[in-house]
Amino acid sequence: MVPNLMTDIEKLQVQVDELEMKQAFQEQTIDDLNEALTDQQFQFDKMQVQLKFLVGKVKGFQSSNMAEESEETPPPHY
C-alpha cells in the first residue's frame, strides 16, 4: 500500500508544480497586458490632445477664410 501512496503523492506534486507554473505564466501575461494597456492609454490620451488641436485649427481656418453666405456677392447671372 505504501508504493501506491507514494505514487499518489508524486502525482499530486506534479499537479501542484503544473499549477504553479500556470499561475506564474498567467501573472506574467497579466503584467504584459497591463503594460500594453497603459501604453495604449497614453497614446490614446496624446491623440485626443492632437485631435482637439486639429479641430481648433480647422474651425479657425474655416471661420477666417470663408465668408458667410450673406457676405458673398451673388453670381453674375442674378
UniProtKB/Swiss-Prot annotation:
InterPro entries associated with the record: SlyX
Matches recorded under Gene3D superfamilies: 1.20.5.300
The organism's place on the tree of life at top rank: Bacteria
Pfam families: SlyX
Protein family according to the UniProt entry: Belongs to the SlyX family.
Protein name per its UniProtKB record: Protein SlyX homolog
Gene: slyX
